[in-house]
C-alpha cells in the first residue's frame, strides 16, 4: 500500500486537511478531517471485501487485481472530502471540486489512468449517490454516513441528518442496508 502512504504524505493533501480544519474549527457537527476520511476508507473496504465483491469490483473497473482494487477503495475514501474547504469558501459542491483536486494527488502517488477514473468518479458521486452513480461512489456515500459518531455526539438532536443517520444505523444492524451493488 505504498501509494496510499504517498497520498497521506502528499503536501497538497496535507494542505487540504489543514484548510478543512481551519474552516471547521468552530463547527459543532461532524468534521471532515483525516480520521473521518480514514474511517470512510475502512468502512468502504469492509463493505466491498465483506461481501466477497473485491474481485468483481476489480474486474469491472479494469483494476490490477485485489491489491489494486483495495488501493483504489482506500484512496477514494482518503480523498473524498479533499474539496470540503472549497465548499465553505465558494459554495462549490465539495464532491465535484474534490474529484478534480484529487487527480494530481493520485498521479503523484502513481495511480494509473483507469484507477484515477474509478477514484475521481466515486469522489464526484459520493454526495448524492443514486441511479447512474458509480458503484464505489454509492459505497462511499453510505460509508460516509455510517462513519458519523451520532451516538456520542453532544449536538446530535440539532443535526439535520440525525434521524436519517439513526435509520441507516438501525438498518445496518439488521443487515438491510440500501443496495450499493
What are the residue ranges of the model-derived segments?
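Metal-dependent phosphohydrolase cores
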Residues: 1-181
Amino acid at each position: 500500500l505504498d501509494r496510499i502512504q504517498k497520498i497521506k504524505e502528499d503536501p497538497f493533501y496535507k494542505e487540504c486537511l489543514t484548510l478543512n480544519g481551519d474552516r471547521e474549527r468552530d463547527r459543532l457537527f461532524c468534521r471532515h478531517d483525516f480520521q473521518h476520511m480514514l474511517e470512510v476508507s475502512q468502512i468502504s473496504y469492509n463493505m466491498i471485501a465483506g461481501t466477497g465483491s473485491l474481485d468483481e469490483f476489480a474486474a469491472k473497473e479494469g483494476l490490477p487485481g485485489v491489491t489494486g482494487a483495495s488501493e483504489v477503495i482506500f484512496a477514494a475514501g482518503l480523498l473524498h472530502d479533499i474539496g470540503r474547504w472549497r465548499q465553505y469558501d465558494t459554495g462549490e459542491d465539495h464532491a465535484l471540486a474534490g474529484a478534480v483536486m484529487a487527480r494530481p494527488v493520485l498521479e503523484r502517488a502513481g495511480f494509473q489512468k483507469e484507477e484515477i477514473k474509478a477514484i475521481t468518479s466515486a469522489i464526484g458521486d459520493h454526495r448524492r449517490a443514486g441511479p447512474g452513480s458509480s458503484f464505489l461512489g454509492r459505497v462511499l456515500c453510505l460509508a460516509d454516513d455510517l462513519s458519523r459518531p451520532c451516538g456520542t455526539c453532544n449536538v446530535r438532536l440539532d443535526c439535520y441528518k440525525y434521524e436519517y443517520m439513526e435509520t441507516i444505523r438501525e438498518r445496518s444492524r439488521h443487515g438491510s442496508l440500501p443496495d450499493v451493488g
